[in-house]
Amino acid sequence: MDRIEWGSLPPTLHDAVQDHIGPVIKAEPSPEGRRSALAATVHTRAGQRLFLKGAPIDNARSVGDLDREAAIAPYVTAIAPELVCDVTAAGWRLLAFDYVEGRRANYAPGSPDLPAVVEAVTALDTLSCPDEVPLKWFDARWSTYAADPRQLAVLAGTAVLHTDLNPGNLLVGPQTVTVVDWAMASRGAAFVNPADLVLNLIACGHAPAEAEAVVHEVAAWRDAEPEAVDHYARTVAVAWLQAFWSYTHPWARAVVRAAQHWALYRMAR
């Protein structure tokens, strides 16, 4: 998605946002939040730092992501930043979150970040939200890629899922790990959260067996039927191969390779 900087947004949008947060004196583009036209850290005159993300309201997909993120925000504050304001003005939808002091997690084999990352993923299993919160159904999201109906059945459930646990979405701070970017939040089987981490660990250099060992103490993973994990790995491999084959972004290519590697490992067990 083409990016825009804070200073290039319509003045009426600036005014609408600043009505909530006060005057902005500095804005720094963020390298994260690739699905948003705007992703920036802003500094206010009062000394506050906030993370802003937004998109034009005529971009239905991006606005849908923002809708989900705003809807789930009140229910994930135990491990995610608080939503400060939600603004629609001048043809834009904009969310402002508390700024998180932290760096992207290091998922490499042997990384000292891994225990805290696993703790954060374990905490996902404690989350819940009302039925009316408009999250995606995980099994429906992947229905295009499942060759066998059993693959979809094992993905269904009511657990709150993040579904994009790449290292840029887990920020390591002095005391804790914060999980950001809930645009793809879904409901589904609880084991999907640790399984998503496994895929991302493989993309960062772990062998499949090593990645699975990292999450072996996570209850949602430990309680999952091996066949369910097999179906997940197979479905994800097909999805990434079909949907992201043409993507040139290095991370997308790494996950495409990781998904195939993991599926073949599960098949050979």
State where each predicted segment sits.
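An alpha-helical support segment within catalytic cores of ATP-dependent transferases
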Residues: 9-20, 123-163, 173-174, 178
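Active-site beta-strand termini and strand-to-loop segments that position acidic
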Residues: 41-47, 99, 173
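Activation segment
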Residues: 57, 102, 168, 177, ...
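Conserved catalytic-loop position in the HRD/HxD motif
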Residues: 164, 169, 181
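Active-site Asp-x-Gly
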Residues: 173-213
